[in-house]
C-alpha cells in the first residue's frame, strides 16, 4: 500500500504516517511543507479569534490573503492571484473557469488548517514516523507552499535525524505547485513509477 498526498492532502498524509505509518509500504509527499510552528500558532490564534466574533462559516478574505497573498511574489507580472499554482497558462485558465476551484474558504477551514499544522509538526509527533517507512518528497522549485523547497528539505532532514532510513527528494526546476499537471507531468509520473518499482 502506497500513500500519496498532494498539497493539503500531503499534510493529512504527514499526520497519517505519524499515527499509522506501519500500515503502509511507502509515502510520497507532493507539494508539501515542513514545520513553521510559530507561524501556524499565530495563525491559529488569529483565526480562532475571528471565529469567536464572526462565526465558523464566515468568509473573511483577509485570512486567505494572509495565507496565500505572498505566493506570487517571485512571479514577474502575475496575471491572477492564483498564478503560483502552475507554470502552464492553459492550466491556470482551466482553474479559473472551474466552479469547483478557488472557492471561498471559511474561518473554520483556517482554524482547522493551522491547528492541524501545529499538531503534525510537533517534534514528538514527527518522531512517531516509523524508521523503516520509505518517504519520497517531490515538489516544484517555484512552489511557494514549501518555501521553494526550504521547509521541505528541513522536514526531510528531521526525518533522517529521527532515524528514517530511506528519505528521497526530487525537485522539478521551474515547476510551481501543481507538478502533477505541469507540462513535464510525464517526467514526474515516470519518477513516481520508478520510485515505486524500487519499493
Language model features by range: what are they?
Residues 105-127:
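Active-site nucleophile elbow and catalytic-triad environment of alpha/beta-hydrolase enzymes
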Residues 1-7:
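Alpha/beta-hydrolase fold nucleophile elbow
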Residues 13-100:
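Alpha/beta-hydrolase-fold enzymes
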Residues 162, 166-199:
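Catalytic active-site module of serine/aspartate enzymes centered on a nucleophile-bearing elbow/loop
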Residues 137-139:
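Short beta-strand/loop motif that positions the catalytic acidic residue
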Residues 144-154:
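Conserved alpha/beta-hydrolase "acid-adjacent" motif
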Residues 129-135, 162-165:
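Short, proline-enriched alpha-helix->beta-strand connector loops that line the catalytic pocket
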Residues 141-144, 175-176:
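Acidic beta-to-alpha connecting loop that harbors the catalytic carboxylate
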Amino acid at each position: 500500500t502506497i500513500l500519496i498526498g498532494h498539497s493539503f492532502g500531503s499534510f493529512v498524509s504527514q499526520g497519517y504516517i505519524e499515527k499509522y505509518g506501519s500500515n503502509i509500504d511507502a509515502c510520497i509527499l507532493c507539494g508539501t511543507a515542513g514545520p513553521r510552528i510559530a507561524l501556524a500558532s499565530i495563525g491559529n490564534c488569529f483565526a480562532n479569534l475571528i471565529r469567536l466574533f464572526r462565526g465558523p462559516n464566515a468568509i473573511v478574505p483577509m485570512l486567505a490573503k494572509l495565507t496565500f497573498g505572498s505566493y506570487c511574489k517571485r512571479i514577474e507580472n502575475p496575471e491572477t492571484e492564483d498564478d503560483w499554482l502552475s507554470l502552464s497558462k492553459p492550466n491556470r485558465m482551466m482553474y479559473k473557469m472551474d466552479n469547483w476551484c478557488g472557492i471561498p474558504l471559511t474561518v473554520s477551514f483556517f482554524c482547522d488548517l493551522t491547528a492541524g499544522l501545529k499538531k503534525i509538526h510537533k517534534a514528538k509527533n514527527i518522531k512517531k514516523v516509523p524508521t523503516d517507512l520509505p518517504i519520497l518528497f517531490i515538489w516544484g522549485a517555484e512552489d511557494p507552499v514549501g518555501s521553494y523547497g526550504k521547509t521541505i528539505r528541513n522536514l526531510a532532514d528531521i526525518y533522517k535525524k529521527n532515524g528514517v532510513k530511506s528519505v528521497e527528494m526530487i525537485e522539478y526546476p521551474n515547476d510551481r505547485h501543481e507538478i502533477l499537471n505541469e507540462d513535464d507531468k510525464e517526467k514526474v509520473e515516470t519518477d513516481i513509477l520508478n520510485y515505486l518499482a524500487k519499493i
